[in-house]
Design a protein with these regions (language model features):
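Glycine-rich flavin
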Residues: 5-12, 17-89
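Residues forming the Rossmann-fold NAD(P)(H) cofactor-binding site
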Residues: 1
Length: 89
C-alpha cells in the first residue's frame, strides 16, 4: 500500500486490489489485533505488580472479553477507515 501511494504521489497510475477488508492480513487479523491483545496482557501483568508499590484495589482484575473484543475491533475498523481515506487522496 505504501509503494502504491508513493507511486501515485510521483504521478504514476496505480491500481490496488484488495479481496477483503482494506488493510490486508496484518491490519485485520494478524499483527494489529495480536499486538492489541499483547498490550492488554502486559497491562494486566503490570497491574498485578502495583500492590508491591502500595497501590490498592488492583487485586482480582477480571477481563470483560466481549467489551475488549468490541474495542479491539473498533480500533481495526478505524485503521481500515484511515487506509481507505489515504487511498482516496
Amino acid at each position: 500500500m505504501g509503494a502504491g501511494r508513493r507511486a501515485a504521489a510521483l504521478g504514476k497510475k496505480v491500481a490496488m486490489i484488495e479481496n477483503r477488508v482494506i488493510g490486508g492480513t496484518c491490519v485485520n487479523v494478524g499483527c494489529v489485533p495480536k499486538k492489541v491483545m499483547l498490550n492488554l496482557a502486559s497491562y494486566l501483568e503490570e497491574a498485578s505488580l502495583f500492590k508491591d508499590y502500595g497501590v490498592n484495589g488492583t487485586e482480582g482484575l477480571k477481563l470483560d472479553f466481549p467489551a475488549f473484543k468490541e474495542r479491539r475491533d473498533a480500533y481495526v475498523k478505524r485503521l481500515n477507515g484511515i487506509y481507505s481515506n489515504n487511498i482516496a487522496k
